[in-house]
A protein has these predicted regions:
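Short, polar/flexible loop-turn hinges at active-site or ligand-entry regions and domain interfaces
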Residues: 145-147
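Histidine-centered, transition-metal-coordinating active-site segments
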Residues: 1-88, 93-101, 142, 151-157, ...
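Short pre-active-site segment immediately N-terminal to the catalytic Zn-binding motif
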Residues: 99-110
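A glycine- and small-aliphatic-rich helix-loop capping segment at beta-alpha/alpha-beta transitions
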Residues: 127-142
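Short, conserved acidic/polar surface loops in the N-terminal third of protein domains
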Residues: 126-129, 189-191
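Active-site alpha-helix of zinc metalloproteases
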Residues: 114-115
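Short active-site segment of divalent metal-dependent hydrolases/proteases
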Residues: 118-126, 235
Length: 413
């Protein structure tokens, strides 16, 4: 009988040679596939076709939570406007920019793609504002229970999703790149730190929960991770300005008219990529010229003043989302403790056959702290789901009635 699916020894030898050629073509500073470290050492199915980091990307893409990128805020919420960037598009931009840099430097593009596509999986609804509000709830909830105060950060939660909630068995290189991706602070040079072990990685992860400043000290453990970290900033620096215009907020766009790196998104991206390459070819670190670094730092600083910290843009988050998130956290935690099996924390989360099983022991008893469960559930929500569950639970109908979305034809009415 003809074998349709299994490779012959000759075919396997060819595929193995392809994989070895891939590693041989990499820069000496790249992360070769042969050095990938996976906690569960079992080789993935079809490992000869899907090398370690290629397999990581598949695990991320097929993660049940990956779809939710599509309705998670990048910067602008409360707009019925499909031209505004959502988290799903942002991670694709990061991946493309990082792979452009990585290709020229002969880095491992498969590792770059895995880190880039998975780096924001732990983001909450309503972007960084939602992240800070959920952290408030988590701190208050753990402290109220007599536990050490714990903090929420989206990069740490991305790792928790892959390690604890859905147990994707990603490589240590991918996980460390995701954990250390936060690029809110511009650096002129990005150099990787030693990789370490999974035990050391877990200690680092726990320290991030307990010390609110510790995550700022993290550095990626591969040059590929460094590229993704810088590409994250490149991807949003100009794009967030572009979205400001697309949101009809031209009156707020008070930016410098001329910059060394450009003022249009396409110029910012292109110029930064070129300068990084000029300074990083045959280097063990990722670098920029001092003048370019300073201009990027100033541009991002302008974004904070004009966009991220604008009082009018932030008002709906602080006036509506923040109190709703605190109310939702308290309600779901109370439902858990009362074992109210009709609550969405059970029906929509813990009863899920995939993610729910990792909160229980062999006898199906819940063994996870309620604060962790509620934090995980809220972090997994999209913007729309968050509003819908608040309405469903009638958390504050008066507050919800104040919520306004900018519609497509508002300017024509």
């Amino acid at each position: 009988m003809k074998n349709y699916f299994d490779f012959t020894p000759e075919e396997e030898a060819y595929l193995q040679e392809v994989n070895e050629d891939f590693d041989r073509a990499l820069s000496p500073y790249a992360a070769p596939n042969r050095e990938a470290v996976r906690e569960n050492g079992t080789l993935p199915r079809n490992a000869i076709v899907r090398p370690p980091y290629f397999y990581d990307t598949d695990c991320i893409l097929h993660n049940p939570l990956y779809n939710r990128y599509a309705d998670k805020t990048q910067v602008f919420s409360f707009y019925r406007n499909d031209d505004l960037t959502r988290r799903a598009l942002h991670v694709q931009f990061v991946s493309k920019i990082a792979r452009t840099i990585g290709r020229a430097l002969r880095l491992n593009l498969e590792l770059i793609e895995a880190i880039a596509l998975g780096h924001d999986m732990g983001h909450t609804p309503f972007g960084h504002k939602g992240e800070s509000f959920l952290s408030e709830c988590y701190q208050e909830g753990t402290a109220a229970d007599g536990l050490p105060k714990r903090y929420f950060f989206h990069n740490v939660h991305s790792v928790r999703i892959f390690r604890c909630i859905l147990r994707s068995n990603l490589t240590l290189q991918t996980l460390s790149g995701i954990l250390a991706h936060n690029g809110e602070k511009v650096c002129r040079e990005y150099a990787p730190s030693p990789l370490g072990t999974f035990e050391e990685f877990d200690r680092t992860l726990e320290q991030c929960y307990l010390d609110p400043d510790f995550h700022k000290t993290l550095r990626p453990n591969t040059l590929e991770g460094c590229v993704v970290r810088l590409s994250d900033m490149i991807a949003y620096a100009g794009k967030d300005r572009q979205d400001l215009y697309r949101a009809g907020l031209i009156s707020k766009a008070k930016f410098e008219e001329k910059r060394l790196i450009g003022t249009k998104n396409r110029d910012i991206v292109s110029n930064l990529i070129n300068n990084i390459l000029k300074n990083s070819i045959r280097s063990s670190s990722i670098n920029m010229d001092e003048e370019v670094f300073e201009d990027l730092r100033d541009l991002v600083g302008e974004n904070y003043k004009v966009i991220y910290e604008d009082e009018d843009l932030n008002r709906p988050y602080f006036d509506i989302v923040r109190p709703l998130m605190h109310k939702l956290y308290a309600r779901l935690k109370a439902d858990l403790q009362a074992r109210d099996f009709s609550s969405p924390v059970f029906t929509h989360y813990l009863n899920d056959r995939i993610q729910g099983r990792n909160y229980r022991d062999a006898d199906r008893r819940i063994i996870t702290d309620p604060n962790d469960i509620v934090t995980d559930f809220i972090a997994s929500m999209t913007d729309d789901y968050f509003i819908d569950i608040c309405r469903h639970l009638h958390l504050d109908d008066e507050l919800l009635s104040q919520l306004r979305y900018r519609e497509y034809f508002d300017d024509e009415n």
